[in-house]
Amino acid sequence: MAAAKPTLTDSLSFCLAQLAAAAGEALGGEKDPATNETPLSRALLALRTRHIKAAGGIERFRARGGLRPLLALLRRAAAAGSAPSQAGPGSAPSSAASGASSPAPASGPAPSAVSSSSPTPPVRLRKTLDLALSILADCCTEGACRTEVRRLGGILPLVTILQCMKTDSIQNRTARALGNLAMEPESCGDIHCAGAVPLLVESLTACQDSQCLQSVVRALRNLADSPQHRLALAQQGAVRPLAELLATAPDAALTLALVRALLELSRGCSRACAEQLSLGGGLGPLVSLASHPKRAVREGTILILANLCAQGLIRPALGNAGGVEVLVDELRQRRDPNGASPTSQQPLVRAVCLLCREAINRARLRDAGGLDLLMGLLRDPRASAWHPRIVAALVGFLYDTGALGRLQALGLVPLLAGQLCGEAGEEEEEGREAASWDFPEERTPERAQGGSFRSLRSWLISEGYATGPDDISPDWSPEQCPPEPMEPASPAPTPTSLRAPRTQRTPGRSPAAAIEEPWGREGPALLLLSRFSQAPDPSGALVTGPALYGLLTYVTGAPGPPSPRALRILSRLTCNPACLEAFVRSYGAALLRAWLVLGVAPDDWPAPRARPTLHSRHRELGERLLQNLTVQAESPFGVGALTHLLLSGSPEDRVACALTLPFICRKPSLWRRLLLEQGGLRLLLAALTRPAPHPLFLFFAADSLSCLQDLVSPTVSPAVPQAVPMDLDSPSPCLYEPLLGPAPVPAPDLHFLLDSGLQLPAQRAASATASPFFRALLSGSFAEAQMDLVPLRGLSPGAAWPVLHHLHGCRGCGAALGPVPPPGQPLLGSEAEEALEAAGRFLLPGLEEELEEAVGRIHLGPQGGPESVGEVFRLGRPRLAAHCARWTLGSEQCPRKRGLALVGLVEAAGEEAGPLTEALLAVVMGIELGARVPA
């Protein structure tokens, strides 16, 4: 087949020349339109179908200067279309449907490319415009062309054509070109300024062609590129026709275009947008489209519904249309493991939370399972950024008893307590228009003011009681404005005050304007917790470890004065008799004392953590709360509850009761009966070596035993008993030292041979007198009685040194201190342990006591610490065990050291709890070790 014969229109230069020639013709020229019509049409057709469609064709067209004549041609057409109707040859008035008249000028007949002589543009003119607008729209798909069109002033002619040429095809291509130009922010602003929006809105209602409607809708969507432009579109009525079209969209393509446009217009939904969409009847179709089979339509519709929730005025209607169920179901699907990413859930979470602001929607959300969904989000650490918003939304259910019961059953209270502990950010502020529509704003005219009020106001201003008319309200009266409490003008801040800062109220203001309590990040969580605490028996939810931990973390960790609501919650719980047993079972009373009174928080144990503290404030609060519990415990109900708990409770409850009693019982008859007569103290001591039921159990136990010791014996016991006085600063004279010199006096008649080969001099008579063991060894029938060099097996020089001193009558000379290692070094396996064993083997009880006293002075004295207590206890000496117990429970030790010492004692005791129990029991009861202890 022969190749197609080349034509003139195959040349871009020829086409551009024809375009330039047509653009340069004057409207009143004498050229016959027929001489240029066919070449121009052929050139435009070739440009659109071949040159522009080719690879790089748009850029070549722009580089060769094709945009300037193309815009000139459109500008001439726009000018002709907007010219006033005049009588003249070849001219006729345009029809009303065209919306404008375009007669030829009086100077002569106009070229057919720009004239109108019929109710619609002439066929040749319409064809020329269709081709030119199509070329321009294609060119505007590239950024460089959009920039040049804007520079050449091509936007205004397009707006004029949109106004004058009401043919669907021309409207379609013009809207398409404007939509492409609107992709540039600068061009978008120029299109708005040129007044294109009302014309596009008019096209929505007048046009019947689906393609044209899609182009107009797309142009409006692209024009909504900023909040200001979206608001302008809504205020110019662009939303309502879109909503009306949504219900009657003839095909899926137009439906998708409408959904995409409404999605863009509803971003940051304005009041005008919501009102127009509601008036246009768009809510029902939107809810229906949420189940559309096409994913793009379905997801776009759901996002539109989510955006609309930002306006309170439309949320009730949205709920009536079924939007609540749609949004809840969609969020539930996206929450599934195989659902969408967390980022895609954010607008839905925000929408569901906003729906909680109206009572009617809260009921729908509750029935749709929204409470379970919100609780799942609260439990999800990946959704932590949304937690403040969700908690604030749940405040809407504050007086919904059924919903509160469901939320409590789902575990809301521990999650709220976690909110008080966390570092979650502030809840995102919503606009004023997102407020609940249960209480819509009403603009009522001001009431007419009576003459008596005007006279009173005039007199108050003249006398200086008011500075202006606004200072006095017609609603004010002495009965409505209670007097302010008498307080100094500048009260001095007291460190023990726990009140939140208050703001003075102006007497002339209405009582409704009273300043409420501070509302910070923790406000919603505290409000919900306060509501739960007002139940008849809130113990199951609030008197638990997590709940108390969260409240106390907030109270002690707040940078400023904590919210009074948190203090009221704690006070309300401690004053409620129904909560007494829960405070005992959960170690809540012990936690209040440890955290608030003693300043030891769970995360400060066992290693302290640096934190800013206001201990005096917290101590006052803790003592007040414990006093509340004391009142409950010493009431007839409390006595019965504690007695039942101690005698008939589970083993864990009995131990918790025994531990808590010294903190909340001050009546001697009560604590003596429960702890001493009915075995509560022994229960507590026996539990020390069992697995701890609470992270701070041993700290609590040390504090409890110390408090009980103070109750039993108000006088303070010395930390180190004075069984054998030993003044280390001025030791007694040494009686053994003369035997060690070069000329000993008296001369030794005996030497002891150690395993190391060292020979130690001794006096036979003194050694036999000091110990029954050596008396039998050296004066009896043993072979050693005839020997001058007596071996002492299993004894090192350091351990033998205090033995030799003691045999020769040294008491308090300091020799007993020699084998004792300094604090921080182990005693087991040391020469001190060896010396103690030797003293027992050689029947030297005085030496044993002296060595034990030396160990106590070094390891349990001022230089020793709680870590030494366990080391001393490991020696297994009853007197040293008593030393350790007295050191641990001594009132001069800080609570932290007491707790750490008890931890060391329990570790040292291991499974053999008997010696530790007896030592602690004897110290608490004030009984010397070895005496009879009451059963």
From Swiss-Prot:
Gene Ontology cellular-component annotations: chromatin; Cul3-RING ubiquitin ligase complex; cytoplasm; cytosol; focal adhesion; membrane; nucleoplasm; nucleus
Q: How is it modified after translation?
A: Ubiquitinated by a BCR (BTB-CUL3-RBX1) E3 ubiquitin ligase complex, leading to its degradation. Deubiquitinated by USP7.
- Record keywords, A-Z: Chromosome, Cushing syndrome, Cytoplasm, Disease variant, Nucleus, Phosphoprotein, Repeat, Ubl conjugation, Ubl conjugation pathway
Q: What is the effect of changing L331P?
A: In AIMAH2; loss of function in promoting apoptosis; reduced ability to promote degradation of SREBF1
Q: Which top-rank group of organisms is this from?
A: Eukaryota
Task: Tell me what happens on changing R334C.
Answer: Found in patients with myelomeningocele; decreased association with POLR2A component of RNA polymerase II
Q: What residue spans carry the region label Disordered?
A: 82-122, 424-451, 467-515
Effect of changing C657R: reported as: In AIMAH2; loss of function in promoting apoptosis
- BTB domain location is 748-816
Coarsely, its chief localization is: nucleus
Which regions does the record annotate with the repeat ARM? Answer: 143-183, 185-225, 227-267, 271-310, 312-357, 359-403, 405-444
Subcellular localization(s) per the UniProt record: Nucleus; Chromosome; Cytoplasm
State the Gene3D superfamilies in the record.
Leucine-rich Repeat Variant (1.25.10.10), Potassium Channel Kv1.1, Chain A (3.30.710.10)
Stretches of Low complexity bias are at 82-118
Q: Which pathway, per its entry?
A: Protein modification; protein ubiquitination
Q: Modified residue Phosphoserine is at which positions?
A: S341
Clinical condition linked: ACTH-independent macronodular adrenal hyperplasia 2: A form of macronodular adrenal hyperplasia characterized by multiple, bilateral, non-pigmented, benign, adrenocortical nodules. It results in excessive production of cortisol leading to ACTH-independent Cushing syndrome. Clinical manifestations of Cushing syndrome include facial and truncal obesity, abdominal striae, muscular weakness, osteoporosis, arterial hypertension, diabetes.
| Annotated PANTHER family | ARMADILLO REPEAT-CONTAINING PROTEIN 5 (PTHR23312:SF8), ARMC5 ARMADILLO REPEAT-CONTAINING -RELATED (PTHR23312)
Known role: Substrate-recognition component of a BCR (BTB-CUL3-RBX1) E3 ubiquitin ligase complex that terminates RNA polymerase II (Pol II) transcription in the promoter-proximal region of genes. The BCR(ARMC5) complex provides a quality checkpoint during transcription elongation by driving premature transcription termination of transcripts that are unfavorably configured for transcriptional elongation: the BCR(ARMC5) complex acts by mediating ubiquitination of Pol II subunit POLR2A phosphorylated at 'Ser-5' of the C-terminal domain (CTD), leading to POLR2A degradation.
Name of this protein: Armadillo repeat-containing protein 5
What lineage is this protein's organism placed in?
A: Eukaryota, Metazoa, Chordata, Craniata, Vertebrata
Q: Which gene encodes it?
A: ARMC5
